[in-house]
Amino acid sequence: MASIWVGKRGTIRDYAGFNPSVDAEAIRKAIRGIGTDEKTLISILTERTNAQRLLIAKEYQALCGKELKDDLKGDLSGHFKHLMVALVTPPAVFDAKQLKKSMKGMGTNEDALIEILTTRTSKQMQEIGHAYYTAYKKSLGDEISSETSGDFRKALLILANGRRDESLKVDEQLARKDAQILYNAGEKRWGTDEDAFTNILCLRSFPQLKLTFDEYRNISQKDIEDSIKGELSGHFEDLLLAIVRCARNTPAFLAERLYRALKGAGTDEFTLNRIMVSRSEIDLLDIRAEFKKLSGYSLYSAIKSDTSGDYEITLLKICGGDD
């Protein structure tokens, strides 16, 4: 059965001739020797898929009586440590941790919440919900409810429940009807009917939404993004704009997130690690192409000029090549 976490446009593929016990032994030596052999760790963990890494971790535990992630945490440091631990974490657990981190402490990282909830499929969201509850004994929905409010909260909860239609079939009649509802809910009236925007944008499939946005332009002579910007505000506006951009082109949306994470003073490693790891087996090749289109330079060169050391080497291996 194909994994819901693997697509056709990733940079990391199954390693041919994979032998988890050989890899586990090599990692044991790399960690247990005098000083850590980072080179071996990087080459094994970036050249295996997540499913293969989890098998290595299982062998490692049988061999050493310790969890691989715990030994990596104890032996490595900084952003390099976070990245390596992410590589040996199951995808749903990784996303659950990222969501927890974005809602922890003072203030909520709305951008991270929006990014994860808009780019994951319904099936993925359901798995993330289970992983979240297993790890924190609280439902993801309850956490979102206590950290957010208003229309933003309402929309996030629908996305967190994994209720978006996933079918690839489109219905032209429904697209026209939805486009008219959106027009009546915003441009055509005084004040805005936020629920209409939430229900359509959070529940319809991406192919269906693309058709709806075309119909919307025919009716209103405006692009849906411009209407959202004119009618809505705050995090709710940001969320709906993210949904529109993901429905149109998810890799382009994520490329823009990477561009912002790498641009200017300082690097947003939280975002950089998350996108590089979570999309490495799904669509990172497409994200790379969109990044170049957006910025005029390659993602590889941006990582190279913005990071250093083992952290840089690992990210470049995940990136998988220069464009």
UniProtKB/Swiss-Prot annotation:
InterPro entries: Annexin, Annexin_repeat, Annexin_repeat_CS, Annexin_sf, ANX3. It comes from the Eukaryota. PROSITE patterns: ANNEXIN_1, ANNEXIN_2. Keywords: Acetylation, Annexin, Calcium, Calcium/phospholipid-binding, Phospholipase A2 inhibitor, Phosphoprotein, Repeat. GO terms for molecular function: calcium ion binding; calcium-dependent phospholipid binding; phosphatidylserine binding; phospholipase A2 inhibitor activity. GO terms for cellular component: cytoplasm; nucleus; plasma membrane; vesicle membrane. Pfam families: Annexin. Belongs to the annexin family. PANTHER family: ANNEXIN, ANNEXIN A3. This is Annexin A3. It comes from Bos taurus. The gene is ANXA3.
